[in-house]
Curated annotation (Swiss-Prot):
GO cellular component, as recorded: membrane; plasma membrane
GO MF annotations, alphabetized: coreceptor activity; odorant binding; olfactory receptor activity; taste receptor activity
Protein's GO biological process: detection of chemical stimulus involved in sensory perception of smell; sensory perception of smell; sensory perception of taste; signal transduction
Extracellular side: 63-73, 155-188, 362-382, 476-478
Membrane-side (Cytoplasmic) residue stretches: 1-41, 95-133, 210-338, 404-454
Membrane-spanning segments: 42-62, 74-94, 134-154, 189-209, 339-361, 383-403, 455-475
Origin organism lineage: Eukaryota, Metazoa, Ecdysozoa, Arthropoda, Hexapoda
UniProt membrane topology term: Multi-pass membrane protein
Species the sequence originates in: Anopheles gambiae (African malaria mosquito)
Protein name, UniProt field: Odorant receptor coreceptor
Gene transcribed to yield this protein: Orco
UniProt subunit comment: Heterodimer with conventional odorant receptors (ORs). Complexes exist early in the endomembrane system in olfactory sensory neurons (OSNs), coupling these complexes to the conserved ciliary trafficking pathway.
Length: 478
């Protein structure tokens, strides 16, 4: 048995409620725990066994009721619905190291004294959105389970059977359970029925929670990346004003070095009459390549100066410390943007295959649901069930498409923000910096499903359009 430390930082601390729920639902998430890991492993394997047993029972029902087309279609939809949960559960277990690696990417973020308040503000915005998303998705999941169980008690509990001798269909009674399943015991009544009913409620809740929690973690990663891009765009104008103080006269230039936005009027760097000793101003905390990127060689923390003989010659009378802080601001922006790019790349590598499996399953399921929707003849149990399946399946696709689309929008607008700021008033360093930013940010950041498609609202629109088109064709052929 092993006990992990209880102090967490960065993205792990932000997603701790999500992580705790994933551990409670049985995910193979053995880090970030405070108790014996052996118990966690036994619990996860037990949960996997319980989920697989019920899933095989659903497959057994599909195999034993393949004669009637309507029954086969309905059972196939149910099987595909829970395939999401099983695949994501197993995928997380097999690919857990990549999840750990992605969570650890944001544990070594550095900030800059001039932009600390902006960084903290956008971090708090991202954190609030993560929590709201988690609450909303979990509430929807619980309500879906309640609705699924409730609708079980309405309508007839029968299935259609084909008589091969006469080629006619007839109905037979089946256990009134939330999910049609094949069991080796008689679940029509008695203790076997009660056990089967409770077991299926457990399966419903855990399987849907497991799948949705993994999606919420993916969307939370994208939320953080989007808010960090907002942070970088927000400080672009201030960065230009700071850089302008290096070679252009600016009245009250000392105001640039006050933390007014943080509620303090104290100077971040004191204007000293004499040329200060710069040894006590260490910039190594602002994204040192060795600590943050694992590079073999560490870049020097002392930034270059263009003053002759190392003397302060700028028109605003800035001290060496202030000059170094201004130049380090550009370094901070570039390295933070690289950090976001690295995070987005890790997100795609970690969750891309799961998105591909999700879309493949959803495409087949939505096609079958469009066929089932043509048979709705009123407000009844059948109609509500089909509409419920359809809305839930589309909501799952829309969830990660909307956040993937926002990432594209935020990353593509970085170049516009760089061009729109007063770059022409900045120093030569700043002008070169803006030019490089515009070149590097021409291509938007995207999340792909294992390189097969890009996660965006265009993907959702194409899926929805295909379903509607197929539905209209079936209606005309009916």
């Amino acid at each position: 048995m092993q006990v992990q430390p209880t102090k967490y930082v960065g993205l792990v601390a932000d997603l701790m409620p999500n992580i705790r729920l994933m551990q409670a639902s049985g995910h193979f998430l053995f880090r970030y725990v405070t108790g014996p890991i052996l118990i966690r492993k036994v619990y996860s394997w037990w949960t996997l066994a319980m989920v697989l047993i019920q899933f095989f029972a659903i497959l057994g029902n599909l195999a034993t009721n393949a004669d009637d087309v309507n029954e086969l279609t309905a059972n196939t939809i149910t099987t595909l619905f829970f395939t999401h949960s099983v695949t994501k559960f197993i995928y997380f277990a097999v690919n857990s190291e990549n999840f750990y690696r992605t969570l650890a990417i944001w544990n070594q973020t550095n900030t800059h004294p001039l932009f600390a308040e902006s960084d903290a503000r956008y971090h708090s915005i991202a954190l609030a959105k993560m929590r709201k998303l988690l609450v909303l998705v979990m509430a929807t999941t619980v309500l879906s389970v309640v609705a699924w169980v409730t609708i079980t008690f309405f309508g007839e509990s029968v299935k259609t059977v084909l008589d091969k001798a006469t080629n006619e269909t007839y109905t037979v009674d089946i256990p009134r359970l939330p999910i049609k399943s094949w069991y080796p015991w008689n679940a029509m009544s008695g203790p076997a029925y009660i056990f089967s009913f409770i077991y299926q409620i457990y399966f419903l809740l855990f399987s849907m929670v497991q799948s949705n929690l993994a999606d919420v973690m993916f969307c939370s990663w994208l939320l953080l990346a989007c808010e960090q891009l907002q942070h970088l765009k927000g400080i672009m104008r201030s960065l230009m004003e700071l850089s302008a103080s290096l070679d252009t006269y600016r009245p009250n230039s000392s105001q640039l070095f006050r933390a007014i936005s943080a509620g303090s009027k104290s100077e971040l760097i004191i204007n000293e009459e004499k040329d200060p000793d710069v040894k006590d101003f260490d910039l190594s905390g602002i994204y040192s390549s060795k600590a943050d990127w694992g590079a073999q060689f560490r870049a020097p923390s002392t930034l270059q100066t263009f003053d002759e003989n190392g003397r302060n010659g700028n028109p605003n009378g800035l001290t060496r410390k202030q000059e170094m802080m201004v130049r380090s601001a550009i370094k901070y922006w570039v390295e933070r943007h690289k950090h976001v790019v690295r995070l987005v790349s890790a997100i795609g590598d970690t969750y891309g295959p799961a998105l591909l499996l999700h879309m493949l399953t959803s495409t087949i399921k939505l096609t079958l649901l469009a066929y089932q929707a043509t048979k709705i003849d009123g407000v009844n149990v059948y109609g509500l069930t089909v509409i419920g399946y359809l809305c839930y399946a589309l909501a799952q696709v829309f969830l990660f498409c909307i956040f993937g689309n926002r990432l594209i929008e935020e990353s593509s607008s970085v170049m516009e923000a760089a061009y729109s700021c007063h770059w022409y008033d900045g120093s030569e360093e700043a002008k070169t910096f803006v030019q490089i930013v515009c070149q590097q940010c021409q291509k938007a950041m995207t999340i792909s499903g294992a390189k097969f498609f890009t996660v965006s609202l265009d993907l959702f629109a194409s899926v929805l359009g295909a379903v509607v088109t197929y539905f209209m064709v079936l209606v005309q052929l009916k």
